[in-house]
Amino acid sequence: GLPVCGETCFGGTCNTPGCACDPWPVCTRD
């Protein structure tokens, strides 16, 4: 399945592919 977004991204970068730091500071599906 697809990777799950949801990590915190206080630095503005998400480590999970296909995820965006929006709304900050939580990664959500880009």
Curated annotation (Swiss-Prot):
Signal sequence, start to end: none
PROSITE patterns: CYCLOTIDE (PS51052), CYCLOTIDE_MOEBIUS (PS60009)
Domain of life: Eukaryota
Modification after translation: This is a cyclic peptide.
Swiss-Prot/TrEMBL GO biological process terms: defense response
Entry keyword annotation includes Disulfide bond: yes
Disulfide bond positions: C5-C19, C9-C21, C14-C27
Keywords per UniProt: Disulfide bond, Knottin, Plant defense
Domain statement: The presence of a 'disulfide through disulfide knot' structurally defines this protein as a knottin.
Functional description taken from the UniProt entry: Probably participates in a plant defense mechanism.
Stated family: Belongs to the cyclotide family. Moebius subfamily.
Annotated protein name in UniProt: Kalata-B13
Native organism: Oldenlandia affinis
